[in-house]
Each structure stands twice: as C-alpha cells, then as structure tokens.
Amino acid sequence: MSKTSLDKSKIKFLLLEGVHPSAVDVLKAAGYTSIEYITSSLPEAQLKEKIADAHFIGIRSRTQLTEEIFDHAKKLVAVGCFCIGTNQVDLNAARERGIAVFNAPYSNTRSVAELVLAEAILLLRGIPEKNASCHRGGWIKSAANSFEIRGKKLGIVGYGSIGTQLSVLAEGLGMQVFFYDTLTKLPLGNATQVASLTEPLGMSDIVTLHVPETAETQWMIGEKEIRAIKKGGILINAARGTVVELDALADAIKDKHLIGAAIDVFPVEPRSNDDIFESPLRGLDNVILTPHIGGSTAEAQANIGLEVSEKLVKYSDNGTSVSSVNFPEVALPAHPGKHRLLHIHQNIPGVMMEINKVFAENGINISGQFLQTNEKVGYVVIDVDAEYSDLAQEKLQHINGTIRSRVLF
C-alpha cells in the first residue's frame, strides 16, 4: 500500500459500546495503532469531547450521532455502525459534512432467524407461561393450547435477508410460508408471496416482522392489524421498536385474542443494563421479552466486527465507499506510482467541470477518475502524477460546492 498523506499512527479510531475485538484485530493488522476502545456508550458531553479528535468512530445501537454531535466532529471521516440498523445516526447530517456511514446489513441474519424460530416453537407449546408457573411453584401439566410447529402457517412481513433465511429454516421444519413485501421478490423454496399485508395476518398461525424503520413502517402494526391476526395467533417482532403499538398488543394478549407474542425491540430502550426497562407487556407470562439481542451471538458479533472494520480500512486506505448507506459508492483500482485525491462536493451543476478545469489549466494528467453521485452529494476519486498532487489539492479545495477534499496517498 502506498504511504498515506497522514501517517496511520496518527489516524484515530474511537470504538464504543464494546464492539467485538475482531474489529480491533483488523485495524491493527492494517497498521492502525491509535485505537481507543470503550466498552459502553458515552454521555452526550463526554461523546462530544471524545469525538472531537477522532477520524473514525465505531458504535452499536445505543450511541446517538445527531447533527449536534457531528458539529463537534471536525476531523471525522467515517462512522462504522457495528449492527444492522443505522437509525441511531443522522445520515443526512453526516452526508452534508462528507462523513460516510457503514454498517453490517447481513452478518447477523442467521442469529435473528434462529431466535425467531425458537420463539415460535416455545410459544406454540406454551412454554413461557408454563416456565413462569413452575418458578412460582405451579404445575401446568396439560396439552391444551400446545402445538407442534410442523404444518403451521408462518406469515413473514418483510422478505429481506432475515426474512428469506427464516423462510428456508421454517420450511425445513415443515411450515407453510407466506410473505408480504412492498417489492416483488423471488420466493425461496415453496414460500408464497401475497399481495397485501392483511393476507398473512389473517391466514397465519405465526406472524413475524422483518422490516426496516421508515416512515411507512412506523406503527404499521396497530390495533386494527393486531385484531386482523387470526384468533389464537402469535406475533413476533425482531425488527424495529417503532413497528408495533405495544399497548394494543398487550390488550390482545390479555383478552386472549392472541395466545402469545415475542418482542425483542421496543420504542424506548434502556441506555444501559443498569436502567429500568418499562413496557406494557411486562408481567404477561405468555409474552417473551428479550433486550434487543436478536443479533447478539458470538458468531454474529465476530462477523460484524470483521465486516464493518474491513469497510472502514478500505475507505481509509484507498477511498472505497462501496456499501456505504449514505454516500455514493466508488471503488477506483490503484494506479502504481500515482497519488490519489478525494473530493466530496454538493451535487450541483458545474462542479466536475471546475474540477477537470483545474487539471487542464495546470497541465496535470489524470491516470484514473471515478465519480458517483446521489441526490445530495458527489464523490470523485482521482489518481494523478505524484509531483502534482499538492498543487491539485490546493486548487480543488477552493472549488465552489466543495465539502471535503484531501490527498489520500
């Protein structure tokens, strides 16, 4: 690898919330040594202080990176979300400041799918309430409302990476799988796509949710939808906490419209393991409540640590932004002996003309150039002759619309 414009020992990584040590191993193997590793999230004031001199930050789901936080992150180049979701990050604020955000959208899919399937089996057998009764000295030895999973209908809402893997596992246990997605998807195995949300609700013994957090999915399962689930059905949510109205779900459990539920995500979650967890579902024996641990397995966390840290290394080493959630995706092959310039700018007319004008007027030959844009930002990676890189950088940073410009190596 070519020598970077900023020595790797001076590039600071701030890793919070005890991300898996595999991330640290990847960073060290790539030559990065300035790594601050903290096992918890930080209070806002301390986060502002710590992020001020960080070039990269790694977080999980508790740390909230707001526009106000980004205002204190003058050196920040990229964010690594060591999880699936990125709703804890103000993606627009990051993009406007030229900060790329990466995540691990697929690394914990198996873990979540296994948890959902296990919960389905436990709820069909009535294990949660039988377990609770035994702990209180009771003894409910009965086959009433106790069922095998084989032959049952599973309704999957959201047929993405988790939904599809769950579909395959469920079919292997003899379930009939139906799924609803806003996009037309290729069914795996013998799964069947249905045309509306109401169809899987009304026909399924178990309904499980696997949708992202968007304006469209917020409270998409309210009282009307919960009552549309067949009587004696089961609802599982391991997606996002804002998808299900929990008060309506609690009512449906109490009046026995549903025989059980499993919830892993909540509208408001404790910031730490020492805080009190509040929910209208507490105290209901036939509801499995788990503290947002769908993807919290040793295997998933190790994979997430590897995936996200490798993306951060690639972005730091050569400017590759492939799979960024808020940034144009660029990957320019290296040109030996050349220097690489990165230019992030507002997506407005004339910027590329001005960039190329700089090279033309100063007699600088371009060895390689890759531009991509999204609705707000343009990102171009340029390889030039080594002797001209400083001159080019000096000119590029003054172009109207420039957000960030630097010599990478």
Predicted regions and their residues:
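Glycine-rich Rossmann-fold phosphate-binding loop(s) that bind the pyrophosphate
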Residues: 159-160
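An N-terminal-biased, well-structured beta-alpha scaffold segment characteristic
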Residues: 1-102, 200-202, 222-228, 371-379, ...
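Rossmann-like adenosine-cofactor binding region
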Residues: 52, 65-70, 178, 182-279, ...
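A conserved regulatory-domain signal marking ACT and ACT-like small-molecule sensing domains
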Residues: 322-409
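Hydrophobic Val/Ile/Leu positions in short beta-strands of Rossmann-like dinucleotide-binding domains
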Residues: 13-15, 156, 343
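N-terminal Rossmann-fold NAD(P) dinucleotide-binding loop
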Residues: 20, 163-164
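Rossmann-like dinucleotide-binding domain for NAD(H)/NADP(H)
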Residues: 101, 223, 232-234, 239-334, ...
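Phosphate-binding beta-alpha-beta segment of Rossmann-like dinucleotide-binding domains, i.e.
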Residues: 97-153, 165-172, 320-325
